[in-house]
């Protein structure tokens, strides 16, 4: 039975000493016999919650069937009783009544719930928190994580470390009950057939654009290595929760796959510390991991990537030299002219020859109307474009659209004072691949000589505005030095009304999102590390104080004048 000083203290409220089942039956908190209780903060409107709930149900049912003393209590974040009832109807555990909003708010505050799904696991007797990382533990380890104590979590970490130290293709790809993989025809292929070969683990999500593009490139890379006699295999690792979707994406791949029913995707994602997609983990002939992700290498070097395989330091030098030679030969026309496509569009729909842009600094602007951040960034870009054009006529921007229909393209382009590629132009795919555009909005700067000067021109333009022109490394370093001088005139710490819990510390940093104006910043931030809170110096200080720092920096840099003679200070 649950101790009154334990879980009851956490879950009870004035006038209520019970929880609910989805049948509406009341269950006395004091009657809970579980020794381990999980508080599940979730809501039906949250897609990640809807994806995680079936995993928690599966783990819960398995633990209950094994006779484990485990209970879950749903703490809803739904917006109304109807949504709560529909969502809770699928759950086999208990819940705090939706009507007890005070208790739900208290629990959210007590356990500092900043996002959902969130699973806090407690000792039912003492109320001690075992872990607040229940979602990750259930996702990765399932029932093996029970009873979720620190000791058990440490055991799992030790097992994982031992597995990595003694890693083989069988330990990575197999299970105690399965020693085979599947071909795209459904044939079973023994994992032992991969021993002594290089193996690439390709994490896939059906229909996800960057993965679809990469797997198309990987297929050519795979076939080329086969052609030259390399012992190389690819194994697809699906991250889809839907078996039908997983099978659909695998059907068009020429390699092997882990059976979807084993649900190993998220476990392997954590094992290999997956950071994003696309990802191709490279395992050597001895079964040990050589590289946690070679997808960027293949993506960057395209059809030449096979010459760098298996991407040792020596092989990478070969690829780097080839890439350098290719970059030296790059011109604006080599980027923007493919066959008869030797033009861009002007505002009146007129075709502007690419040759007329040669000798100018050109920003390639990857964007789309459907993209919220793109719409938010556009006014800033238009403003800075006009400022640059006032001083530099040798400058232009080309809009490269990811819009899905002509009307959206036309409407979005109508608000831009620059040029564009036609919607659906084949050069878009070529340019996106060349510059590895992973998201939008994105700005790539091409110098007057036709060579790339900045793959990310958005960050310096956001930070420095028109002063970032012409986006060369020398110019950006000059701007950084100027800002560093300005920062010498700013206070090292301050308190601000937007974050009065802690002091904000002036911190040198890369890029960040300002919690004051919601715009991006770089170089310097007033930051609270404890709360992951950032403010632009201009938001923290106000423009006058920031300018004061600017004035002080300029005063230090100006010559000192005395007696009619100016000398360097």
From Swiss-Prot:
Its EC number is 1.8.1.8. The keyword Disulfide bond does not apply. It catalyses: [protein]-dithiol + NAD(+) = [protein]-disulfide + NADH + H(+); [protein]-dithiol + NADP(+) = [protein]-disulfide + NADPH + H(+). Residues 560-569 have a biased composition (Low complexity). Keywords: NAD, Oxidoreductase, Repeat. GO terms for molecular function: thioredoxin-disulfide reductase (NADPH) activity. Residues 1-158, 171-315, 321-488 form the Thioredoxin domain. It holds the Pfam family C1_2. Residues 544-569 are annotated as: Disordered. Probable thiol-disulfide oxidoreductase that may participate in various redox reactions. Belongs to the nucleoredoxin family. This is Probable nucleoredoxin 1-1.
């Amino acid at each position: 039975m649950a101790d009154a000083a334990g879980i009851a203290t956490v879950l009870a409220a004035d006038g209520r000493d019970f929880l609910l089942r989805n049948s509406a039956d009341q269950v006395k908190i004091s009657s809970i016999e579980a020794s381990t209780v999980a508080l599940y903060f979730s809501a039906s409107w949250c897609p990640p919650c809807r994806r995680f709930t079936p995993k928690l149900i599966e783990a819960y049912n398995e633990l209950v069937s094994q006779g484990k003393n485990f209970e879950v209590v749903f703490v809803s974040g739904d917006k109304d009783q109807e949504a709560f009832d529909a969502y809770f109807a699928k759950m086999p555990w208990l819940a705090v009544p939706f009507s007890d909003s005070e208790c739900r708010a208290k629990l959210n505050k007590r356990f500092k719930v900043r996002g959902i799904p969130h699973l806090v696991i407690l000792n039912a007797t003492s109320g001690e928190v075992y872990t607040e990382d229940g979602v990750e533990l259930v996702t990765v380890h399932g029932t093996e994580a029970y009873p979720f104590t620190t000791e058990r979590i440490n055991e799992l970490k030790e097992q994982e470390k031992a597995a990595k130290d003694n890693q083989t293709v069988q330990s990575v790809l197999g299970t105690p009950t399965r020693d085979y993989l599947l071909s795209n025809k459904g044939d079973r292929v023994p994992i032992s057939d991969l021993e002594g070969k290089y193996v690439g683990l390709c994490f896939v999500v059906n229909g996800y654009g960057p993965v679809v593009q990469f797997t198309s490139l990987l297929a050519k890379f795979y076939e080329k290595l086969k052609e030259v006699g390399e012992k190389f295999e690819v194994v697809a690792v699906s991250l889809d929760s839907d078996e039908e979707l997983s099978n659909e994406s695998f059907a068009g791949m020429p390699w092997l796959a882990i059976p979807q029913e084993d649900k190993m995707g998220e476990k392997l994602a954590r094992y290999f510390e997956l950071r994003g997609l696309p990802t191709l983990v490279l395992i050597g002939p001895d079964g040990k991991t050589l590289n946690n992700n070679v997808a960027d290498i293949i993506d960057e070097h395209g059809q030449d990537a096979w010459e760098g395989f298996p991407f040792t330091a020596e092989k990478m030098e070969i690829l780097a030299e080839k890439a350098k030679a290719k970059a030296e030969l790059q011109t604006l026309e080599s980027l923007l002219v493919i066959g008869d496509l030797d033009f861009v569009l002007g505002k009146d729909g007129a075709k502007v020859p690419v040759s007329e842009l040669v000798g100018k600094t050109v920003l390639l602007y990857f964007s789309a109307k459907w993209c919220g951040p793109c719409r938010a960034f556009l006014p800033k870009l238009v403003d800075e474009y006009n400022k640059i054009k006032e001083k530099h006529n040798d400058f232009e921007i080309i809009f490269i659209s990811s819009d899905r229909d002509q009307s959206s393209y036309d409407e979005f382009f109508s608000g831009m004072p620059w040029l564009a590629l036609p919607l659906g132009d084949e050069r878009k795919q070529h340019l996106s691949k060349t510059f590895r555009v992973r998201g939008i909005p994105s700005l790539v700067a091409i110098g007057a000589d036709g060579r790339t000067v900045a793959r990310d021109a958005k960050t310096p333009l956001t930070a420095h505005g028109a002063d970032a022109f012409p986006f060369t490394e020398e110019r950006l370093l000059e701007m950084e030095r100027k800002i560093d001088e300005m920062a010498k005139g700013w206070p090292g710490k301050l308190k601000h009304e937007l974050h009065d819990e802690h002091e904000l510390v002036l911190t040198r940093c890369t890029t960040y999102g300002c919690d004051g104006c919601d715009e991006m910043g770089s170089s310097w931030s007033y930051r609270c590390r404890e709360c992951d809170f950032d403010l632009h110096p201009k938001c923290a200080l106000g423009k006058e104080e920031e300018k004061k720092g600017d004035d002080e920096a300029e005063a230090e840099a100006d010559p000192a004048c005395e007696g009619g003679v100016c000398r360097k200070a």
